[in-house]
Swiss-Prot record:
Belongs to the SHOC2 family. Residues 1-52 have a biased composition (Basic and acidic residues). This is Leucine-rich repeat protein SHOC-2. PROSITE patterns: LRR. It comes from the Eukaryota. The keyword Methyltransferase does not apply. Core component of the SHOC2-MRAS-PP1c (SMP) holophosphatase complex that regulates activation of the MAPK pathway. Acts as a scaffolding protein in the SMP complex. The SMP complex specifically dephosphorylates the inhibitory phosphorylation Raf kinases, stimulating their kinase activities. The SMP complex enhances the dephosphorylation activity and substrate specificity of PP1c. Transmembrane segments: none annotated. GO terms for biological process: positive regulation of Ras protein signal transduction. Keywords: Cytoplasm, Leucine-rich repeat, Nucleus, Repeat. One of its GO terms (cellular component) is nucleus. Gene3D superfamilies: Ribonuclease Inhibitor (3.80.10.10). Disulfide bonds: none annotated.
Length: 577
């Protein structure tokens, strides 16, 4: 069994299985109706004739080699000439329009005649090639919205401080290395977008924008925020994600109207205690920082409905924190340093719908920890150090998705039968030797992943999983399959690669919806049942490294449709050809 060595490292994929599946999927479906020579090739194979191409056994490829030529680019907007832009300006003036849309016209320079359009309140210039704005834009004193995103602006003219009514300024995706000084003088601004520039600092003059409700400066290179941000008392959304912040000023606690605070993907080492003053906060993004703790005062943010602390250095939470956050329904503590569940007892999970504890160092799920978690539907414990499951495991009746992959589980309790709502069960990369008979009670199960365990057989009760669509048994020690597998008529994906199978049961022919079948690397599999020919939807089949001597190389090279046709002609189903 493999395990993650580094913090961001995913568990290894066994023996190239995932790569094989990727290659096989590239083949795509092969339609028998499109291949006029298919029957003759099968006939040649029966007579012992060799394919002149000399294709290797186990190599799948598409028979439909038609090259679809790309259509010439259509619908692209032509570069607007200066005359066309002037024409648009004239039309706007003549019609006395208050809205001018010059977006995506490949404009390099705005005509100075724009100064005459003093009536407009909205000007859209996004998606052009502007490197600067003419000072004459400052004449547009009635502007309320100015959209300049997706240009190449490096500065703004000082004349813009005449725009006393401007409420929304969009400067996303430009080449600004600083917030243009004139921006701080636009005191009527309520919305300011500066995302994806090259800004390194926010100046103290930010306090001159007291009406701001929305400030987005994400995806820049900002290392600190000024204390003056605390004077933005009307701020509702503050997005500073994807920057280089190590600390937040304590004055952030003065912004008590904030409901959405996004700080993810920074270098934050701590949070100020004053964050507890943000009593209206409903969304707090802290994932991918360097936090080793969160302040106890966070418990005052009782409106939080989502808390994501993924990929920090946190090993514990303040006792009672989660119990106080009664509206949190999604909690992500993945990729941290937890060695045990947070202290606080069952009440801390009473409102949780989704809990993600992936990639920590937890070796035990405490008995009764979810006794009050009546709405818990998704639990991700992947990549921890679990060796067993709690005795009350069978009481998790509301669980819909359960991921226990990459642990050290040696068995699944028989009372797994109590998980009557479960639809997705991931148990890959463990040490399981067998499955409990109770698995057959999971009647809603759609996906069951048991890859890379030590299974030697499957219980007959697996036949009761009538809704199962994906069954992954890759890299185990299976020698046979139960005949009841034929009852899984909704199955579309069946992974059996890297086992010790000696044969497939003829009941596999009843899997009428099967689309993907992986049999690769079964060294004892010498033949395929004729009944496989009945799987008419089969489009991906991986059989490399199987000694299937009864299949001629040219048939194997032809892909699933060739193999199915060959099996039909060889067996009792030739009348279907």
């Amino acid at each position: 069994m493999s395990s993650s060595a580094g913090k961001d490292k995913e568990p290894k994929v066994s023996s190239g299985t995932k790569e094989r599946e990727k290659e096989a999927k590239a083949v795509g479906p092969v339609k028998e109706s499109k291949d006029k020579d298919l029957k003759s090739k099968v006939k040649d194979a029966k007579e012992g004739k060799r394919d002149p191409v000399g294709a290797q056994a186990g190599v799948a490829f598409s028979l439909d080699n038609t090259i679809k030529r790309a259509n010439p680019a259509s619908g692209m907007r032509k570069k607007a000439s200066n005359a066309e832009v002037i024409k648009e300006l004239s039309k706007c003036r003549e019609e006395n329009s208050t809205r001018l849309d010059l977006a995506k016209k490949s404009i390099h320079m705005l005509p100075v005649s724009i100064k005459d359009l003093t009536q407009i309140t909205e000007l859209y210039l996004y998606g052009n090639k502007l490197q600067s704005l003419p000072a004459e834009v400052g004449n547009l004193v009635n502007l309320v919205k100015l959209a300049l995103s997706e240009n190449s602006l490096t500065s703004l003219p000082d004349s813009l401080d005449n725009l006393k009514k401007l409420c929304m300024l969009d400067l996303r995706h430009n080449k600004l290395r600083e917030i243009p000084p004139v921006v701080y003088r636009l005191s009527s601004l309520t919305t300011l977008f500066l995302r994806f520039n090259r800004i390194t600092a926010v100046e103290k003059d930010l306090k001159m924008l007291p009406k701001l409700t929305m400030l987005s400066i994400r995806e820049n290179k900002i290392k600190h925020l000024p204390a003056e941000i605390g004077e933005l008392c009307n701020l509702i959304t503050l997005d500073v994600a994807h920057n280089q912040l190590e600390h937040l000023p304590k004055e952030i606690g003065n912004c008590t109207q904030i409901t959405n605070l996004d700080l993810q993907h920074n270098e934050l080492l701590d949070l100020p205690d004053t964050i507890g003053n943000l009593s209206s906060l409903s969304r707090l993004g802290l994932r991918y920082n360097r936090l080793s703790a969160v302040p106890r005062s966070l418990s005052k943010c009782s409106e939080l409905d989502e808390l994501n602390l993924e990929n920090n250095n946190i090993s514990t939470l303040p006792e009672g924190l989660l119990s106080s956050l009664v509206k949190v329904n999604s909690l992500t503590l993945a990729r941290n340093c937890f060695q045990s569940y947070p202290v606080g007892g069952p009440s801390q999970f009473s409102s949780i719908y989704s809990l993600n504890m992936e990639h920590n160092r937890i070796n035990k799920i405490p008995f009764g920890i979810f006794s009050r978690a009546k709405v818990l539907s998704k639990l991700n414990m992947k990549d921890n150090q679990l060796t067993s499951l709690p005795l009350d495991f069978g009481t998790w009746t509301s669980m819909v998705e359960l991921n226990l992959a990459t642990n050290q589980l040696t068995k699944i309790p028989e009372d797994v039968s109590g998980l009557v709502s479960i639809e997705v069960l991931i148990l890959s990369n463990n040490l399981l030797k067998k499955l409990p008979h109770g698995i057959g009670n999971l009647r809603k199960l759609r996906e069951l992943d048991l890859e890379e365990n030590k299974l030697e057989s499957l219980p007959n009760e697996i036949a009761y999983l009538k809704d199962l669509q994906k069954l992954v048994l890759t890299n185990n020690q299976l020698t046979t399959l139960p005949r009841g597998i034929g009852h899984l008529t909704n199955l579309t994906h069946l992974g059996l690669g890297e086992n010790l199978l000696t044969h497939l049961p003829e009941e596999i022919g009843t899997l009428e919806n099967l689309e993907e079948l992986y049999l690769n690397d079964n060294p004892n599999l010498h033949s395929l049942p004729f009944e496989l020919a009945l799987c008419s939807k089969l489009s991906i089949m991986s059989i490399e490294n199987c000694p299937l001597s009864h299949l001629p190389p040219q048939i194997v090279a032809g892909g699933p449709s060739f193999i199915i046709q060959f099996l039909k002609m060889q067996g009792p189903y030739r009348a279907m050809v």
